[in-house]
Amino acid sequence: MKLRLKVPQWHYSLLTDYERLAIFKNAIERVVDEDDVVFDLGTGSGILAMIAAKKAKKVYAIELDPFTYDYAKENIKVNGFNNIEIIEGDASTYNFKEKADVVIAELLDTALIIEPQVKVMNSIIERGFLKEDVKIIPAKAISTIQLVEAKMSHIYYDEDIKSEEVSEEVIYEEVDFHKTNPIEVSYNIELELEKSCENLGIKLRTYTILDDKHVAGQTSMLNPPLVIPLNKKVDKGRVKINLSYRRGGDLESIKVNLG
């Protein structure tokens, strides 16, 4: 599948994350049928909408940012997709003309803390825009927690800077996008700290379940591991943690307390 695309500068990294694009493409091509109505929520460059439109009867592609919307509109026109309706608007408030057979919503980030995936999907569900047998891509997100020796005193993504892992990695939440989910969350977690740490931190990872055949881990532009330092010296042994944050908020909403 060859497409001609123009994108804002900040979208180049998304388009060149081929691992991320490939797994979404594979899931979309597997899930979408020829009679389907598809919503692409937060369409960005429009690339996922165009992949869906190769098979779907109709695709509604919505983008909040007016600058990005202009690029998506041009991309869809240049590539000759007459079955895509491009919309400038907020997916959480826009009134769609019909219900969706398939929803694509790549509004993802680590632990769903910053991006509005949960808020948008809650709104679509609550306002009755989904058919009973709707297929959602991604279907779920699973997040894990692990203790680390933090390398910095502020929140950072554990990419170029690797933090020493000092506990097992455990699942602390599973979010199913077929149902409404809370915006404010709080978790009590107990982990075994394998060695004493000068600056204990927690590392969060998110694994994206696109459908029953496709699972995405971390890629260069999808859910990089996030480290939250506690800036405390903690001795080896059992560690009780309370982790809370606001989904679709910002990193400042994260609160971590030792029990």
From Swiss-Prot:
CDD domains: AdoMet_MTases. Gene3D superfamilies: Vaccinia Virus protein VP39. Coiled coil: none annotated. It comes from the Archaea. SUPFAM superfamilies: S-adenosyl-L-methionine-dependent methyltransferases (SSF53335). One of its GO terms (molecular function) is protein-arginine N-methyltransferase activity. To M.thermoautotrophicum MTH738. This is Uncharacterized protein MJ1452. The lineage of its organism: Archaea, Methanobacteriati, Methanobacteriota, Methanomada group, Methanococci.
